[in-house]
Amino acid sequence: MPRRRVIGQRKILPDPKFKSELLAKFVNILMVDGKKSTAEKIVYTALDSMAEKSGKDHLAIFEEALENVRPAVEVKSRRVGGSTYQVPVEVRPVRRNALAMRWLVEAARKRGEKSMAQRLAAEMLDASENKGTAVKKREDVHRMAEANKAFAHYRW
């Protein structure tokens, strides 16, 4: 525990177009080398093409994709008497969002489409339909936690 006062989390400003804090956080995660305007352009282009393809609202698809990628549990390493156990722990809400966004961006970067906006749009559409690499990553994390359920009593 820190002896000084605990510093609260920095308030993030909502994005200029949709006034969404989640979307602003997503832009920040996508951003490379501090190029925020480029990241915003990529995200907005991806959202526009997604809305065009599916006929749904921009933010609705984004929220649905995030919801399908958010992990409920994850495993953390815990050393007990010389051996290391993978202990399943529940994921805090802020970390859930952060992991989901990070996994979406990683999965989009590995795709084969031409531009990053196309890759991101395709990955988010897949995630909103419960398929794709990011959803597979969440399933793997859940499977790992399920397999190590026996060590849940080592939680701290």
Swiss-Prot record:
Cite the GO molecular-function annotations of the record. rRNA binding; structural constituent of ribosome; tRNA binding
The cross-references to InterPro entries, in alphabetical order and at most eight, read: Ribosomal_uS7, Ribosomal_uS7_bac/org-type, Ribosomal_uS7_CS, Ribosomal_uS7_dom, Ribosomal_uS7_dom_sf
Q: Which UniProt keywords apply?
A: Ribonucleoprotein, Ribosomal protein, RNA-binding, rRNA-binding, tRNA-binding
Specify the superkingdom. Bacteria
Name its GO BP terms in alphabetical order: translation
Q: Output the Gene Ontology cellular-component terms.
A: small ribosomal subunit
Q: Does the keyword Endoplasmic reticulum apply?
A: no
- Carries keyword RNA-binding? yes
What CDD domains does the database record attribute to this sequence? uS7_Bacteria (cd14869)
Function, please? One of the primary rRNA binding proteins, it binds directly to 16S rRNA where it nucleates assembly of the head domain of the 30S subunit. Is located at the subunit interface close to the decoding center, probably blocks exit of the E-site tRNA.
HAMAP family from the UniProt entry: Ribosomal_uS7_B (MF_00480_B)
Family assignment from sequence similarity = Belongs to the universal ribosomal protein uS7 family.
**Subunit text:** Part of the 30S ribosomal subunit. Contacts proteins S9 and S11.
Q: Which named protein is this?
A: Small ribosomal subunit protein uS7
Which species does this protein come from? Vibrio parahaemolyticus serotype O3:K6 (strain RIMD 2210633)
